[in-house]
Structure formats: structure tokens, C-alpha cells
Amino acid sequence: MVTINDLSFNPDYSSISVSTSDGFKIFNCEPFGEFYSSQESPLRKSISNSLEDSAGCQNPTHSKTDSQDTPARFPTAFLKMLFSTSLTIVVPQTQDNLGNRLLKIYNLKQNLKICELNFPSSIIDIKLNRKRLLVVLDTGQLYIYDLSCVRLLKILQLSFNEHDGDQKFIGDLSADDSSWLIIPVQSTNNQTDLLNAETGSQPSTPKLTPSDSVINTGSYSQYLEFTRNSSLSNLKKKNKLITLEDIKNDSEGWVVVYDTINLAPVVIFEAHHSTIARICISHRDNKVATASIKGTIIRIFDLKEFEGKVKVHKVKNLRRGHNLVKVNSLSFHNDNHILGCGSESNTIHLFKIHEEESDICTNENSEDRTNHNSDYEDSDGDTSKSSEDLNENLANLLISKPLDPVPMETEDKLSSSWFVKTKKLINNQYTSSIIKKLPYKDYFENLIWEPPQRSFAYIKLPEYAPHNEKDPRSNKVEIGFNNDLVFIASYHTGNFYQYQIPKQRGPVSSINEDDKREECSLISQFNLI
């Protein structure tokens, strides 16, 4: 039985690769079609021809006496593509206890191996763009390479929490040349060195030594950005230096944006109160999407530079649902107008995220707007609905008064201006003092500032994959986009789906959104195996 090890879109979603226990294949997404395979074919030149036997790599399971109709097996753990170029990263899958420690860089067009790297432990993830190659090991090391010359620049020492038997890397690398790496602060430890920008003389083939990491004692105060969600953080009261350990103790939901070009932190902000489960960065404009382990709220942080410093310009909150669920996929559309979210519920949600003109902030009032961004508290599952009802009643007690009956034609106008009036009312000092004493003050503030935004479209896959503790990726999907199409690749079946995105009729209102959500239409279905 063929096992899917990895599914991966290239950064512009034009191609998708599948790595299996038999080999790998690369497909064009639209129009769909296979254009490369590791298995021998008389119609296609294969990279298999240039794979030579090496230590740590399983030998091909065929001989010269084999029939030409019998495909060769080259088990592959990972395959990553650099946009639509011929440069490809391949990690062969091994059957021994040493793990997948060998990485090879190929030029597929010329069927030529450029170089290979051996690592001290097994590779669990790979990130790359035109400037940088990141290799993540199961022992917590993150290797940062200059891709242009495959030169090792830095090794970050991290800590990974094994969740549901799946040891994975939580983080993302921007596709543009800024090369920002976003990781949870909880993934750092006392040996994580984010402040030392010296590259030193690093060997092309890494060897793990105690000097690869430096004890972290530096101050990160200048990189902290406090949003409305973190306005009550104890870190604001500290006058002395703030270490990564201080940030970790404050909350589990802080994330750090790290510049892999200049090897220095960019900004650190609190995304959630709970542990971060998923991070995704947009293809442009520096938008960061995060999900916590609760999986009820997705947050999008718009990062912009003001006076030489990167700040959180705006926060958008997206309500995935009320039930606790594991979010396993987040993907931005190429134009940044849509965010796709997949979870173990087997439903994919599509959120409209582009800003209306009234939402755009100028440099003059950006700081004020940042302090007043809404930030919904993570849902607590079964009690979320009752909390909403309670806080809605509290809102009515504070901001409502008996009104005379109004004609039907004026009702819509009053409804549309309700949130504008309440935003002004919340600035009242007396009202603010009352809110601080409420048992559900966090949720109440969010209710006043901005109603929760739900998805405008969704996808129910024709397959059902129940959660399997032995295989955490059994119900995981990868999401890609191309204009008005959304691509879904399933780990469970190896199927590749193309769906039509419903046309958006104006801005998605936060009121009665359940009536406006539409199901995407299935256009075509293929198999990647």
C-alpha cells in the first residue's frame, strides 16, 4: 500500500507534488496534468536516472533484469519546488532508524544533481524561497541557508512539542524576498539565539556541536508590540530587560517574526492566549494568519513599517466555529483577498479578508487604530454560545434604551449605524470603567468593537476521514488557489479536487452571515497516486 508522506504546492500554486513510499510525482494544477515522476517511463526523463546510491539512502528496488514495465521505487519523504523553476529539493525516505537525514538539490530540467547535504538527525520540514532554504530537524535545530550558494548562515535551537504523536514544526517562511520566518515564542528555549547576527564560517555540510547554539540572555523589549489583546500583559509593567523566557511565561500565544536575511528579530506580538497550532504568511503585504489549539478563532495580523519599525497595523478576527477542533491547514490566496482554513472537521472554510476603504488606516492615526483593534477571545467550546448570549444581554443593558417603534424603511439605516455609535460610546470613561468589572469583559469588548466575521463560502469534501491518532495527517488537506478556483489535496485518499469559488456579492456583512454562506461547486477530481 502506497503511503503519502508529503503534499506540497509550490508558492504560486501552479504545481503540486506528492511524495510517497514509492516515489514522487509533480502535477500541473490548472490545467491538471502530470509532468514529472520519479518512476521510470519511456515517455519521460526521470530524476531517478541521476540518483546514485549513497549512505542513508535506500537502494532502488529494481535491477537490470527487471522489465521496463516495472517501475522503480525511490521512496521520498519530502519534495519542495521553488515557484515554477526547475530547482527542486528532494529528501529520500529511508527504512533504517537513522531517519531521513539526506537532502539533495536538483535541477529537474537538466536532470542534474546540484549538491547534497547530510544532517545529524532526521528532517521533519523544509521551507524555501528565492533567497533562503530552511531545514528543520526532529532534534529542534533549524538550519538557515543562503540558497544562492547553499551556504549555512545560522542554526537556531528550538523545542517542539509532540502533539497527537506527530512531531511537527509550527511556523512559516514568507515567499517574497523579505524572507520573514514566523514561529511561536513557545518553540524557543534558553539556547535560542535570535539576536546574534554573525554568520561566522559555517561548513556546507552541517555538524552539530555545542557551539552551534548560544545561551539566550539578551533583551527583546524593543521588538515587543502590544495589541488590544495584550494590553493587560504583565510585560508592559516590566522596566528591566525582557527575555524570551519572560515572554513565554506571560502567555503561550506570542509569536516572533524573524528576518532570515539580516538574522535579527523584526517584531514580537501576542496572537492568542492559547498555544499556537498553525501559522501562515501571505505571498505579499506581510499578512500573518494564526490559529490556536482551540481552533475556533483565526486571526490575521497586518504588519506594516512605521518610522523604521514594523508594527501590527490591523487585526482581523475570523470565526471558524464554536466547537474545539484542530486546524491543520491555512493558506492565503495569491491576491490576499481570501484565506482558506482546513481542519479535522473535514470542512474547508473560505474567508473574505481584503479591506474596505473605510478600514484602511493612515500613518497619522495608525497607532490609535492599533490600540483599538478588536481581538476576540478564543472560544471555550460548549460554553461559547451561552457566553455570546450573556454578553449580548450585557451590551443591551449598557448601550440600549427604550426606543419608539420605527418605520420599516428606517430600520436598515438604524441597524447599519448601530456599531458606529457603539464604538463612540465605548470611548466614554464611565462605560469603560464598568466594562473592566464585568466577568466577561474581554468578550464584551470584542462584541462592541466588531462582530465576528464568518466564512463566505465552504467546502464539504466527498470523502470522510475520521481522526486517527496513529496517523495525525489522516484528515489533513493542503489548500491552493488560482483565480476563482480553489484546490484541495487530501492526505487520506490522495485525491486532488478543483472547486469553483462563489462570486462575492459586495462586502460580507457580519449580520446573518449564515444565510450568505455558499458551498463551493466541485468542478473536477483527480488522483495524485
From Swiss-Prot:
Native source organism of the sequence: Candida albicans (strain SC5314 / ATCC MYA-2876) (Yeast)
Membrane topology: Peripheral membrane protein
SMART domains: WD40
Protein name (Swiss-Prot/TrEMBL): Autophagy-related protein 21
Region (Disordered): 49-70, 362-388
Positions with biased composition (Basic and acidic residues): 366-375
SUPFAM superfamilies linked to this entry: WD40 repeat-like (SSF50978)
Domain free text: Contains a beta-propeller domain involved in specific binding to phosphatidylinositol 3,5-bisphosphate (PIP2). The L/FRRG motif is essential for the cytoplasm to vacuole transport (Cvt) pathway and for the recruitment of ATG8 and ATG16 to the PAS in nutrient-rich medium and in both its recruitment to and dissociation from the PAS under starvation conditions.
Pfam families linked: PROPPIN
InterPro entries in the cross-refs: PROPPIN, WD40/YVTN_repeat-like_dom_sf, WD40_repeat_dom_sf, WD40_rpt
Gene that this polypeptide is encoded by: ATG21
Role noted for this protein: Required for cytoplasm to vacuole transport (Cvt) vesicles formation and mitophagy. Involved in binding of phosphatidylethanolamine to ATG8 and in recruitment of ATG8 and ATG5 to the pre-autophagosomal structure. Protects ATG8 from ARG4-mediated cleavage.
Localization terms from the record: Cytoplasm; Membrane; Vacuole membrane
BP GO terms, sorted: autophagy of mitochondrion; glycophagy; nucleophagy; pexophagy; protein localization to phagophore assembly site; protein transport
Motif (L/FRRG motif): 318-322
Domain of life: Eukaryota
First and last residues of every WD repeat: 271-311, 321-361
Gene Ontology CC: cytosol; fungal-type vacuole membrane; phagophore assembly site membrane
Comp. bias intervals (Polar residues): 49-62
GO molecular function: phosphatidylinositol-3,5-bisphosphate binding; phosphatidylinositol-3-phosphate binding; protein-macromolecule adaptor activity
PANTHER family: WD-REPEAT PROTEIN INTERACTING WITH PHOSPHOINOSIDES WIPI -RELATED
The entry's keywords: Autophagy, Cytoplasm, Membrane, Protein transport, Repeat, Transport, Vacuole, WD repeat
Similarity comment: Belongs to the WD repeat PROPPIN family.
